[in-house]
Amino acid sequence: MHTPVLTDRVLELLAPALSRPGAVVVDATVGLGGHAAALLAAFPEVRVVGLDRDLDALAHSGERLRALAPERVRLVHAVYDEIGTVLAGLGSARVQGVLFDLGVSSLQLDTDARGFAYSRDAPLDMRMDATRGLTAAEVLNTYDAAALARILRDYGEERFARRIAESVVRARAVEPFTTSARLVDLVRDAIPAPARRTGGNPAKRTFQALRIEVNSELDVLARALPAAFDALAVGGRLVVLSYHSLEDRLVKRELRGYAETLVPPDMPVVPAGAEPRLRWLTRGAEPAGEVEKADNPRAASVRLRAAERTAPNPDRTQPTIGGAS
């Protein structure tokens, strides 16, 4: 059974917003439905809108969640930057909570045919939505060396990005890449021997970079966070679980602007409409506790940030937390 990460803390942070009558929460990455199931159980009146780009995940979570509370669940095949469009289609003007549990899911990692895991030989796919987009194999076989080096450096924080990229280009001229084992071997051979002995599997950063590129993860997240903020009613809460530093830094940067006033710092009075629209609920990024890390390996790298919407957008009226859509 999949164990969701930091469930108790997520429920604690969302509780003040979701305890109100008629509350709606968006699980923007519903996955196998672990967090959503906990939300349905903890808040007997809350309605959950679950989004996922992975049809396999939606099939699993749909079976699980509809068995719990079919009348309180709506699941939608969508990417999480489409929150606004999805809510408009459902007739929900504002919601009281939004949850993001980012990164690759347990289902994706455990299904060999999806190609996310570097520990097993499998087709190089890595698409979270298997119905569209380039596969990892197509990226490896078509991007030039400069583009490959860029994504390895920017998305994998790989020190040996250029060496790996050049090795990929040479190898694919002999035979195109199709499966993961060959790529794992290439990465191991491309980097200096001392680097192979530190930091776990040498291919980890390359696989992360390819996955982020294939799914446009950081670009989607940069669009999704403002969309989620706009969807929140005043008093609504946003919780984000990140699993690597690129995600966490992006979350901090995108939300920081909402926590600042819209006037110069030397102004003696902050006029109405220029006050901060968000307050942080967490001090920095919170990790999981040692007990949870021991019980749930996926919790080892998690970083949680949470915030509450405190004001509407300038020159715009919107309902407060009591006015659920």
From Swiss-Prot:
Its main location: cytoplasm. Residues 285-325 are annotated as: Disordered. InterPro entries: RsmH, SAM-dep_MeTrfase_MraW_recog, SAM-dependent_MTases_sf. GO terms for cellular component: cytoplasm. GO terms for molecular function: rRNA (cytosine-N4-)-methyltransferase activity. Keywords: Cytoplasm, Methyltransferase, rRNA processing, S-adenosyl-L-methionine, Transferase. GO terms for biological process: rRNA base methylation. Residues 315-325 have a biased composition (Polar residues). It catalyses: cytidine(1402) in 16S rRNA + S-adenosyl-L-methionine = N(4)-methylcytidine(1402) in 16S rRNA + S-adenosyl-L-homocysteine + H(+). It is found in: Cytoplasm. The keyword rRNA processing applies. Its EC number is 2.1.1.199. Coiled coil: none annotated. S-adenosyl-L-methionine binds at G33, G34, H35, D52, L87, D101, Q108. HAMAP family: 16SrRNA_methyltr_H. NCBIfam families: 16S rRNA (cytosine(1402)-N(4))-methyltransferase RsmH. Specifically methylates the N4 position of cytidine in position 1402 (C1402) of 16S rRNA. Belongs to the methyltransferase superfamily. RsmH family. This is Ribosomal RNA small subunit methyltransferase H. The gene is rsmH.
